[in-house]
Swiss-Prot record:
Name of the protein described by the UniProt record: Histone-lysine N-methyltransferase NSD2
Top-rank taxon: Eukaryota
Residue numbers binding Zn(2+) 2: C1026, C1041, C1046, C1052
Designated gene of the protein: Nsd2
A GO BP annotation: atrial septum primum morphogenesis
Modified residues (Phosphothreonine): T110, T114, T422
PROSITE patterns in the cross-refs: AWS, HMG_BOX_2, POST_SET, PWWP, SET, ZF_PHD_1, ZF_PHD_2
Organism in which the protein naturally occurs: Mus musculus (Mouse)
Phosphoserine modified-residue sites: S121, S172, S376
Assembly and oligomerization: Interacts with HDAC1. Interacts (via PHD-type zinc fingers 1, 2 and 3) with SALL1. Interacts (via PHD-type 1, 2 and 3) with SALL4. Interacts with NANOG. Interacts with OGT. Interacts (via HMG box) with NKX2-5.
Length: 1365
């Protein structure tokens, strides 16, 4: 039979000849069609899972998938009948020669193995041909073996195709890593043993490339001793070993696959391994080589500091570990490679690393025997299966492969070609670390990672959901099956810890159900088929939705079914299940769906980690995030947020009961170690919980348990932690916290009552800080700090960023942040400008945040000691999704967004951080970092940051960051407004409903004596006694009648305030004005609508509340003044009248009435109000606190602002006329018209020079400074002495036109003034000069001293200076 494969993007044209063979019912000697004792190692199973062969040669053609003839990867389930295709005939009838070839493969190779042959049977020759997928070469395989001619011809064709596709297609880094793994695994020769378990050698000439030939091309091979250099650590002795996942000791790294890495294991008392680049490895020759290596590294150091660091001796914490590694390396150097590998290769038990028992014993580390490790690991696996007693069809595919590898490894123990660095994986308890081990100094995570099959199947579905889009984008031409295989290849490269990140709520429940299944019966096996067929057992699942869960569990069971029929289609069902999750509501539980692999979210249900973190002292701890390692030294940092993310997710699941109306179960935390677990509850008043170990107890005490404080009756204050003075307990029953009254008064959330006080742990600080007047009610789940009286509502909206969640209802708040010495990003920093005026100078800096102010801008004096801004005193904290400015290092203040720790990439989550720190995302640069409250401040609308925004380098990045920050700020603002609107539309803000005014503080309510109440003249026989249409004297004077005084008695209709006769109204949500009040029936003009009631406060309290409202940006408040000593505040307490809005054209008015001697305010209709109309009144009546608040009443005469008088009809008409009036045309002045011409000579002496001009309009006088008696120019507007009286300086009325002499009315009498012919007057001085022949001299009218007219008390100004000609 001959058929050809046409050329396609996935294959190279080949002609394959196959001989028709007789089918037999037995396969490899099994009577029932099943393989028995067929031992196939892991390399073979991996290879077979990636080879594509026809299930039946009788079909005549090969399978086609998506139009392609060959596929690069297929699961092992599709090839389970491979033996029926190849090994036909009787058992051991054929001499099959398996040769797996790969070009450019450098790795470990083992001698090939063959099965027995039988004379007379046709010979089957298998050759795997190199195929191409998207222009990328895969491995080779085909059924042939005629010599080197076919090989060289195929190599030539492959080289041509490879060169062609390399020019046309771009290489994929992620795909290349999978490609290399496939090449390496294909190069490893697998061993298939006969039913009799006989090992038959293979002729070496059957394979042109053996593993030994490939090893000669590599610089290092398995078992070689090397020095490795990892940043931050000295040169360390290592041994090259094979990676337990890739089953290879080398791989190519980098964008162009130009850098080679080797897998090494570090010598020492802690088993740790890593991938190291070849340039960081040097062959090990002895300890004396260390100094030389340090000197060579120092010569290549880029900076002097780095050089000093490299030459520095090994620190004390690493010295013991390093010296032990040197001893082990020198011992290994004296051994042969096989002995070295046998003794020093790590044991991979389960998913953990362990030292060889012999090495651990020499190092003084106590470990369990290997047999006990295997026994103890059986409980953590799915079930302990005996290969000899359980049929192979009852073993799942994954576990069957593990069993085959175990048996294969045992049989290959004496084979020198067998790789001993990859023993069978067994779950084992971690051995005790050595004292000097850096990994031993790490805090363990408290629970081992799960490896249950139910979890693995569910995790794979989540993995497919998240990363399907990525793979499809990289391989658009691939079919669905190919995408499934690529995803499976990526999944197989992850270790158990990385796989655990893809847990879901469903996988948790399935895992628990699997554990129950494993405990049923004798523990030997589980009947998945029976459980899948019996849906009655699903009733035990308590979580909702049941229907979707049952469907998912059914699909997961189908994936794990062992029968041949379901194994063939399991991978397709997994694809369908994963894709269906995208279109169902289950995507809500998979919050990380459709996110790239780099930024995937962390697992929401992994085991919670312990608080605290210690820096690793091993070289492998400095590996990059892309390196794959199973060593304990590569575990993520055990930061407070690790447990925070998990606890919050678990809390959100458990809180569903409370959403259905049931109270959530309280989770207690130990008061000593602040951790959860099995706790002992105190039955005393403190309601505390403790671990037995924390109390020093070995077992639970009998009877009633009380802690030491409750037993002694001396409790410590929860704030100051001291018990010297008297403490009082919170009145809430289950609280149990004690406080000094002085300490608890410092917190504004403390509520004092008649029986005591309610502590701040029962109110949300975020809700109070955002709206102190109307905070959100304390109902709902609260998360309380275990160290101080701070509490928040559960959820990201209220919980402050930086809080460490230690239980579903317990946190450690950000107030307990401790700055570490030597860390620059922990230092506090303040801005260099005022937050009010944006100017520098002498600033008052906040001690908790970067805020700074001028004391004058805050209207306060410069305080002594520490000072905190208003926001910090009020308890305002940053929340997730807040846009902020961050100061990091030497960079400018940079815009960023506060991120939740579970929404950042895994490498950012692993960064070491303290309680109170939170991750931020920098706009523009797309970077992340951990920071805290003292280095950030909120972003405000309109912020522009630094003015230095260039078009190159960091300036351009900063400009883009500002644009991104502004867009994100507006987006988050709209989201929050929509959420607040949705919440506010449900019901009005909370307040306390009262019926009459409640006095506050010193305010009193007056009550008059009955004899003082006026009596009206109404009679009970009148039609409407004391009604609105009657002539009741009390009604006219706005007095309410008293029932014991009014003649009408019970028929009196002037008792609306006392009887509260209000028309029926309802509260509604208005457009743009918040909540309002509408009438439900028609209201007549003058009818009483409602009484305005609230808290009665005095003026001092009123001003204090207004000041507090201004400081905290509270705008929704209204104070109504009754008289000088009493003001009504209806904010915290009131009735329906508090919802009435303002209007410049209202339908109600406020009137002061006297009721039983006390003044009260009533609302009366000023016009007929139909039903459904909103009730409004004018707030301008004796109101305080409204400063230019925009009015939104929409009336025609709206003034625009609250507090301003509404526009009258006259003003409206004048405005209309003004708008219609045309602008008057103005006559243009001629050039020079209206300008005055100043004199060029001094008005006193008549000479020219530098003159001072008078600033008075139309005055042209000019003077010398010496003539005015001045030494410098006058400042400001200056008028010459001619305009002021020479005696008193008042404005002059009589002027001399020849000199500056002038006088006012009072002093002009007695002065001789004469007039010239042109009407100008002159003084007597000029008359004497004119008439020199006169015999009689006129006496001077004023002393000589008064003639000095330049020295005036008024401020003068220089206006203009001219030069005389």
């Amino acid at each position: 039979m001959e058929f050809s494969i046409r050329k396609s993007p996935l294959s190279v044209q080949k002609v394959v000849k196959c001989m028709k063979m007789k089918q037999t019912p037995e396969i490899l000697g099994s009577a029932n069609g099943k393989t028995q004792n067929c031992e196939v190692n892991h390399e073979c199973s991996v290879f077979l899972s990636k080879a594509q062969l026809s299930n039946s040669l009788q079909e005549g053609v090969m399978q086609k998938f998506n139009g392609h003839d060959a596929l690069p990867f297929l699961p092992a389930e599709k090839l389970k009948d491979l033996t029926s295709c190849v090994f036909n005939g009787e058992p051991g009838a054929h001499d099959t020669k398996l040769c797996f070839e790969a070009q450019e493969v450098k790795g470990i190779g083992t001698p090939p193995n063959t099965t027995p042959i039988k004379n007379g049977s046709p010979e089957i020759k298998l050759k795997i041909t190199k195929t191409y997928m998207n222009g990328k070469p895969l491995f080779e395989s085909s059924i042939c073996g005629d010599g080197a001619a076919d090989v060289s011809q195929s190599e030539e064709n492959e080289q041509k195709s490879d060169n062609k596709t390399r020019r046309n297609r771009k290489r994929s880094i992620k795909y290349d890593s999978l490609l290399e793994q496939g090449l390496v695994e294909a190069a490893l020769v697998s061993k298939i043993s006969s039913p009799a378990d006989k090992k038959i050698p293979v002729k070496k000439e059957s394979c042109p490339n053996t593993g030994r030939d490939r090893d000669l091309l590599l610089k290092y091979n398995v078992g070689d001793l090397v020095w490795s250099k990892v940043s931050g650590y000295p040169w360390w002795p290592c041994m090259v070993s094979a990676d337990p996942l890739l089953h290879n000791h080398t791989k190519l790294k980098g964008q162009k696959k130009s850098a080679r890495q080797y897998h090494v294991q570090f010598f020492g008392d802690a088993p740790e391994r890593a991938w190291i680049f070849e340039k960081s490895l040097v062959a090990f020759e002895g300890e004396e080589q260390f100094e030389k290596l340090c000197q060579e590294s120092a010569k290549q150091a880029p900076t002097k500091a780095e050089k000093i660091k490299l030459l520095k001796p090994i620190s004390g914490r690493l010295r013991a570990q390093w010296e032990m590694g040197i001893v082990q390396a020198e011992e290994a150097a004296s051994m042969s490679i096989e002995e070295r590998k046998a003794k020093f290769t790590f044991l991979y038990v389960g998913d953990q690393l362990h030292l060889n028992p012999q090495v651990a014993k020499e190092a003084g580390i106590v470990t369990e025997p290997l047999g006990e490790m295997v026994d103890s690991s059986g409980a953590s696996e799915e079930a302990a299966v005996d290969p000899g007693s359980v049929r192979e069809e009852d073993i799942p595919t994954k576990r069957r492969r593990r069993t085959k590898r175990s048996s294969s490894a045992e049989n290959q123990e004496g084979d020198p070609g067998t790789d001993k660095s990859t023993p069978p994986k067994m779950a084992e308890a971690e051995p005790k670390r050595g004292v000097g081990s850096p990994a031993g100094r790490k805090k363990s995570t408290g629970s081992a990672p799960r490896s249950r099959k139910g979890d693995s199947a569910a995790q794979f579905l989540v993995f497919c959901q998240k990363h399907r889009d990525e793979v499809v984008a990289e391989h658009p031409d691939a079919s669905g099956e190919e995408i499934e295989e690529l995803l499976g290849s990526q999944w197989s490269m992850l270790n158990e810890k990385q796989k655990a990140r893809y847990n879901t709520k469903f996988s948790l429940m399935i895992s628990a159900q699997s554990e129950e299944d494993s405990g049923n019966g004798n523990g030997k096996k589980r009947s998945h088929t029976k459980r899948a067929d019996d849906p009655a057992e699903d009733v035990d699942v308590e979580d909702a939705p049941r229907k979707r869960l049952r469907a998912d569990k059914h699909s997961l069971r189908k994936r794990e079914t062992i029968t041949d029929k379901t194994a063939r289609t399991s991978s397709y069902k997994a694809i369908e299940a994963a894709s269906s999750l995208k279109s169902q509501a289950a995507t809500k539980n998979l919050s990380d769906a459709c996110k790239p692999l780099k930024k995937r979210n962390r697992a929401s249900a992994t085991a919670s980690s312990a608080l605290g973190f210690n820096k690793s002292s091993s070289p492998s701890a400095s590996l990059t995030e892309h390196e794959v390692s199973d060593s304990p030294g590569d575990e993520p940092s055990e930061s407070p947020y690790e447990s925070a993310d998990e606890t919050q997710t678990e809390a959100s699941v458990s809180s569903k009961k409370s959403e259905r109306g049931m109270a959530a179960k309280k989770e207690y935390v130990c008061q000593l170690c602040e951790k959860t677990g099995s706790l002992l509850l105190c039955e005393g008043p403190c309601c505390g919980a403790f671990h037995l170990a924390c109390l020093g107890l070995s077992r639970r005490p009998e009877g009633r348990f009380t802690c030491t404080e409750c037993a002694s009756g001396i409790h410590s204050c929860f704030v100051c932690k001291e018990s010297k003075m008297e403490v009082k307990r919170c009145v809430v029953n289950q609280c149990g916290k004690f406080y000094h009254e002085a300490c608890v008064k410092k917190y504004p959330l403390t509520v004092f009552e008649s029986r005591g006080f309610r502590c701040p742990l029962h109110s949300c600080m975020s809700c109070h800080a955002s709206n102190p007047s109307n905070p959100r009610p304390s109902k709902g789940k609260m998360m309380r700090c275990v160290r101080c009286p701070v509490a928040y509502h559960g959820g990201d909206a209220c919980l402050a960023a930086g809080c460490s969640v230690i239980a579903s209802n317990s946190i450690i708040c950000t107030g307990h942040f401790t700055a570490r010495k030597g860390k620059r990003h922990h230092t506090h920093v303040n801005v260099s400008w005022c937050f009010v005026c944006s100017k520098g100078g002498s600033l008052l800096c906040c001690e908790a945040c970067p805020a700074a102010f001028h004391p004058d801008c805050l209207n306060i004096e410069m305080p002594d000691g520490s000072w905190f801004c208003n926001d910090c005193r009020a308890g305002k904290k940053l929340h997730f999704q807040d846009i902020i400015w961050v100061k990091l290092g030497n960079y400018r203040w940079w815009p960023a967004e506060v991120c939740h720790p579970k929404n950042v990439p895994p490498n950012i989550q692993k960064m070491k951080h303290e309680i109170g720190e939170f991750p931020v995302f920098f706009f523009g640069s797309k970077d992340y970092y951990w920071t805290h409250q003292a280095r950030v401040f909120p972003y405000m609308e309109g912020d522009r940051g630094s003015r230095y925004q260039g078009v190159r380098g960091i300036g351009r990045v900063f400009k883009n960051a500002l644009q991104e920050a502004e867009a994100r700020f507006n987006e988050v603002k709209l989201q929050r407004e929509a959420r607040e609107t949705q919440e506010s539309e449900r019901k009005p803000p909370p307040y306390k409903h009262i019926k009459v005014n409640k006095p506050y503080g010193k305010v009193q309510i007056y009550t008059a004596d009955i004899s003082e109440i006026p009596k009206c003249n109404c009679k009970p026989t009148d039609e409407n006694p004391c009604g609105s249409d009657s002539e009741c004297l009390n009604r006219m004077l706005m007095f309410e009648c008293h029932p014991q005084v009014c003649p009408a008695g019970e028929y009196c209709q002037n008792q609306c305030f006392t009887k509260r006769q209000y028309p029926e109204t309802k509260i509604i949500k208005t457009d743009g004005k918040g909540w309002g009040l509408v009438a439900k029936r028609d209201i007549r003009k003058g009818e009483f609508v409602n009484e305005y009631v609230g808290e009665l406060i005095d003026e001092e309290e009123c001003m204090a509340r207004i000041k507090y409202a201004h400081e905290n940006d509270i705008t929704h408040f209204y104070m109504l003044t009754i008289d000088k000593d009493r003001i009504i505040d209806a904010g915290p307490k009131g009735n329906y009248s508090r919802f009435m809005n303002h209007s410049c054209q209202p339908n109600c008015e406020t009137l002061k009435w006297t009721v039983n001697g006390d003044t009260r305010v009533g609302l009366f209709a000023v016009c007929d109000i139909p039903a459904g109309t909103e009730l409004t009144f004018n707030y301008n009546l004796d109101c305080l606190g409204n400063e230019k608040t925009v009015c939104r009443c929409g009336a025609s005469n709206c003034s625009g602002f609250l507090g301003d008088r509404p526009k009258t009809s006259a003003s409206l008409s004048s405005e209309e006329k003004g708008k219609k009036a045309k602008k008057k045309t103005r006559r243009r002045r001629a050039k020079g018209e209206g300008k005055r011409q100043s004199e060029d000579e001094c008005f006193r002496c008549g000479d020219g020079g530098q003159l001072v001009l008078c600033d008075r309009k139309f005055c042209t006088k000019a003077y010398h400074l010496s003539c005015l008696g001045l030494g410098k120019r006058p400042f400001g507007k200056w008028e010459c002495p001619w305009h002021h009286c020479d005696v008193c300086g008042k404005p002059s009325t009589s002027f001399c036109h020849l000199c500056p002499n002038s006088f006012c009315k009072e002093h002009q009498d007695g002065t001789a003034f004469r007039s010239t012919q042109d009407g100008q007057s002159y003084c007597c001085e000029h008359d004497l000069r004119a008439d020199s022949s006169s015999s009689t001299k006129t006496e001077k009218p004023f002393p000589e001293s008064l003639k000095s007219k330049g020295k005036r008390k008024k401020r003068r100004c220089w206006r203009r200076v001219t030069d005389g000609k």
